């Protein structure tokens, strides 16, 4: 059964109308018995019960547009997998798309409309950490589960954590713990300059980086704060060069990374250790000739881990008609497994009740095989943040075969990259949350 994906720019009233009209048309066709295959499907519970609607929310324009597409593909693959075997609890899963934009106030409005007007069952996506914080706060008010697939501010698992939100990406603190420890060990001097994007994500990662630098015997000697629009990447790099330091810790996101590193001479990486908290495949593959320093990721399409080759083959078959992102990256991988975790929790509990699902997700553990990684993973019940393998990688440009440019240098288990402040997260009491059973 194909996923019904709706244009993200549609107003919510139209979106709800389209969902209703589409479903009524499907049921009418089944009732008329126009197709034998549809008649056979009509005998299954998924055809007679109301569909389970999940809203995929990710900014489809701006510096995260490609990330949003990759995230949606991962969610689609999981939904299609469950629908192929009859849906969930006898209900077809329908994925609808809505653009929350990169404006936090607008994102909150979109969440409110999806819940109160379109009556969706769950929200999934985000990409941008400010959007995730804004939308998940609204979801918490209504008791609607928010599955944060791919935003990586450490604050998502501490001050912006919620009982109804589960975060499936590693955060910048996890990546920077691995990267800064390595970089500081390679240099006799331990002076660090921070290059930070001036938004929730950047500031949260910079704050975590300061503590990590101090822990490993370094000192932060300066910080260059750049606007989100990154109007002058070369100017920002000149400011960094003016500071004497052995390590440069970069927390710049999305396509801004491409614009920044396009201005860097690769020889700079020999004189200094540069690290980037997280680099997604969507910032690498579109600019294969751009030099990159060390960075962190959670998965790569060419990992020699159980299940990876099969997942890549499914992806390439499913999206063979597209020119963009012919290979899946960490964003697609995270969204696929996050969506699968939600749907599996519904199957295991036999319910869509939010209280039951929260309890199930809080206790979930995954084997390394299930995660296509090197280590087992688990959902931290205190912070609702997935603890998983972190990979240290670099980019050796191969413009002729860009998919082969990424080189995995090593990996660390969850215990070695854990962000200690998550232990102090304060989630709302489950008993105080309204029940919601879509």
Go through the PLM ranges and name each one.
Residues 2-3, 15-17, 23, 35, ...:
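Extracytosolic ligand-binding ectodomains
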């Amino acid at each position: 059964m194909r996923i019904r994906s709706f244009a993200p720019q549609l107003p919510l009233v139209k979106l709800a109308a389209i969902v209703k009209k589409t479903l009524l048309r499907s049921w009418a066709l089944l009732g008329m018995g126009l197709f034998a295959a549809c008649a056979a499907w009509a005998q299954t519970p998924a055809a007679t019960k109301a569909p389970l609607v999940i809203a995929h929310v990710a900014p489809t324009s701006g510096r995260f547009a490609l990330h949003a597409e990759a995230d949606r593909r991962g969610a689609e693959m999981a939904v299609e997998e469950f629908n192929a075997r009859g849906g969930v609890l006898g209900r077809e899963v329908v994925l609808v798309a809505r653009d929350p934009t990169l404006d936090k106030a607008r994102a909150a409005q979109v969440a409110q409309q999806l819940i109160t007007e379109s009556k969706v069952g769950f929200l999934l996506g985000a990409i941008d950490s400010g959007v995730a914080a804004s939308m998940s706060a609204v979801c918490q008010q209504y008791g609607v589960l928010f599955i944060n697939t791919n935003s990586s501010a450490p604050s998502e698992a501490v001050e912006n954590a919620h009982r109804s939100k589960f975060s499936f990406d590693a955060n910048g603190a996890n990546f920077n713990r691995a990267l800064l420890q390595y970089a500081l060990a390679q240099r006799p001097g331990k002076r660090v300059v921070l290059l930070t994007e001036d938004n929730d994500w950047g500031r949260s990662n910079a704050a975590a980086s300061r503590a990590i630098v101090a822990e490993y015997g370094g000192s932060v000697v300066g910080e260059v704060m750049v606007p989100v629009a990154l109007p002058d990447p070369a100017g920002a790099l000149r400011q960094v060069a003016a500071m004497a330091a052995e390590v440069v810790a970069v927390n710049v996101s999305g396509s801004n990374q491409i614009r920044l590193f396009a201005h860097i001479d690769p020889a700079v990486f020999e004189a200094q250790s540069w690290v980037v908290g997280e680099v997604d495949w969507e910032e690498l593959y579109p600019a294969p000739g751009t030099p990159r320093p060390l960075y962190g990721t959670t998965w790569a399409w060419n990992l020699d881990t159980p299940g990876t080759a099969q997942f890549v083959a499914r992806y390439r078959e499913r999206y063979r008609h597209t020119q963009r992102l012919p290979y899946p990256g960490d964003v697609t991988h995270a969204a696929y497994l996050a969506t699968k975790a939600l749907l599996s929790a519904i199957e295991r509990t036999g319910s869509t009740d939010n209280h039951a699902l929260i309890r199930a997700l809080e206790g979930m553990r995954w084997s390394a095989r299930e995660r296509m990684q090197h280590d087992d993973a688990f959902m931290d019940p205190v912070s609702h943040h997935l603890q998983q393998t972190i990979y240290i990688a670099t980019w050796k440009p191969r413009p002729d075969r860009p998919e082969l440019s990424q080189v995995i240098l090593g990996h660390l288990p969850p215990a070695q990259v854990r962000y200690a402040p998550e232990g102090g997260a304060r989630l709302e009491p489950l008993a105080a949350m309204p029940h919601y059973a879509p």
